[in-house]
Amino acid sequence: EGKKPGSTIDRIVSFIDMPKTWLSLTGAKVTENFQGRIFLGHDTEPESRYHFSWRERADERFDNVRVMRDEQFAYHKNYAPFAPNGQYLAYMHNMKATGAWEKYHQAGKTTAVTGRFFRPRPSEEFYDNFKDFHNIDNQIDDPLHQSKIKELKKELRRQQLKYFDSGLIPEEMRNRIIREKKTTVYAFVRDPKLYPLAKYLDYADLALERKKKNL
């Protein structure tokens, strides 16, 4: 209402905001089990302070990443830092541009920025989206940002526990346990005996520190 075609709204919008918003705009009932915030129309809700993003796959490849951001800053946690963003994907590598780019990288012609796509990732990343929209300058070690990094890391863990992040064990291991226990993913991640998530998060943090003393 009151928005012209092509206009924009100045707030963070998540995918989980969309079903709730579309139902609201059509006058349909929005039940309490819907997550997200309505961002258009008569029933617009206050913007969420934080935005949670995740990824467990990149098409046929395993790629485990979590992101917590607010309006300006974004904290990335790479649970599989050994896998580059540019790991082999059949669809992507079928494109001539990808092949040419990779050959250029293998020939040692890319820079620290243009070749990063094909290199292993750091365990953690932190970006200022106002100054660095494309997330190129990783400031995870900048002393000036440690307070904000701590805040976003704390919020990430809180939401992982609240929403039962199911990606802390391999997908096939999860499926095997579900078959053996004759249960569902929904029930499995809510059973601390089968899936002690807090411990798994702690173990993952130790591994991501990449320190010999943690072995």
Regions found by a protein language model. Give the residues of each.
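Contiguous mid-protein beta-loop-alpha structural module that forms a pocket-lining wall or clamp
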Residues: 4, 18, 28
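C-terminal cap/loop subdomain of S1 sulfatases and analogous C-terminal strand-loop tails that border
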Residues: 11, 26-125
